[in-house]
Amino acid sequence: MDILSFIGCKNSQLKGDKMRVPNHIGVIPDGNRRWSVDNGLSKDKGYTFGLDPGLSLYKLCKDLGVKEITYYGFTTDNTKRPPLQREAFVKACVDAVKLLSTQDADLLVVGNSDSPMFPKELLPYTTRKTFGKGGIKLNFLVNYGWEWDLSNLDQNKSSKRSNIINCIKTNDISKVDLIIRWGGRRRLSGFLPLQSIYSDFFVIDDFWPDFKPEHLLNALNWYNDQDLTLGG
């Protein structure tokens, strides 16, 4: 669905200059396993049903003019899950990255690629690459851990506050304006701790495989009403 058509039908506010569109949206696509159980499937089956929502969200954000999206694929803690589930979400992340690489995007996969848990198929994506016409920055966190991300800070303790962002592993990812989490959980789960310091955080109770455009619309309407203080 073209988001401008959707927006025109649902809420004319988003079409005007009054709408504050976030430059960078973080996406925590939670609830895949609970969705599977609710639909009579084993827990490992739900991840595949999260692929189309990821592509749909990308298209909606691109049409709206969002400049950057970061998807939370899986964390180093997630790899402690049962092998069947782990294999399923790793495969889903590989498939998702390959699917997004067919779009117009500047794509980057970020995570601990030195670990055996990092899928080898995604190694070529650990350097940002332009696909199609490029334009929108797409970041995909794979085998990501906040401790891994910040580990360089121990070696750069003398760095000034303004230079800290250059020392972390995710230094090519911008500050996040809005984080949207599906699945109802009210926590960030270690999502980009430095870039998310002043992020607004919106939670959607529906599970990720049940994504619908209204979710994004509701998040953007809520975001538009927030005061931008940055601690001031």
Predicted feature locations:
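Flexible, compositionally biased loop and terminal segments
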Residues: 2-232
